Amino acid sequence: PLGESVSFGTLEEGGYGVLLCDGDEVLASTALQVLDDTRQRLRYGFVASYAPDKDVEAVARLARKLHFNGIQFYDWAYRHADLVGGGETYLDPLDQPISLETVRRLIRALAQAGSRSFGYAAVYGVGNEEWDQWKDAALMQCDGTPYELGGFLQIVDPAARAWLAHFIADLQKCVEQGGFQGFHLDQY
């Protein structure tokens, strides 16, 4: 009967289709995957809005329905070179409203749905607001001009010691303040 649980016992690693039938009639279907480590087969989705009133449970339900085990948090950071420096609420570089509490609520809800949360971060992107601080670490073209992207993002040498120390510390703050389990490190 509906509402009762069924135990499959111990299953070997692999993917399984599950059908709920009443005689020859299929009432519902789903799938499951058994793995020692979900990183072996990442099923990846993304989130791109973090307004204070976001329905995080709806996102978690969709992640569960689609069997996602990893979710990238795209465009969540305050600035490319200052990921969590904007306080609890701010506008991202594209002027979208961000609530860090919404980010944290999403991370918790997605964890309950079986998904790990990965913050997006640009490995060597610096916005115009922070460029003066980092222009000594600029990645230069052959003609001596700095590389840039779209007029809003400057490119620094990812091996520059000061940048690397800053970037690693910024990622650590994201783990401590947000709860991310990892990062999608973009290289453009």
Outline where the language-model segments fall.
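A cross-family glycoside hydrolase active-site/sugar-binding cleft signature
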Residues: 45-48, 72-74, 118-122, 184-186
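An acidic-aromatic substrate-binding cleft motif
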Residues: 27-79
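Beta-strand-enriched, solvent-exposed domains that form extended recognition/catalytic surfaces
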Residues: 1-37
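Aromatic-lined substrate-binding rim segments of carbohydrate-active enzymes
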Residues: 77-127
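A general structural detector for well-ordered alpha-helical segments in enzyme core domains, enriched
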Residues: 58-62, 99-106, 170, 174
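Short, well-ordered coil/turn segments that N-cap beta-strands
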Residues: 67-69, 111-117, 179-181
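Active-site-adjacent "subsite" loops/lids of carbohydrate-active enzymes
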Residues: 38-39, 48-52, 119-178
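Active-site-proximal loop/short-helix segments
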Residues: 78-81, 85-88, 133, 179-188
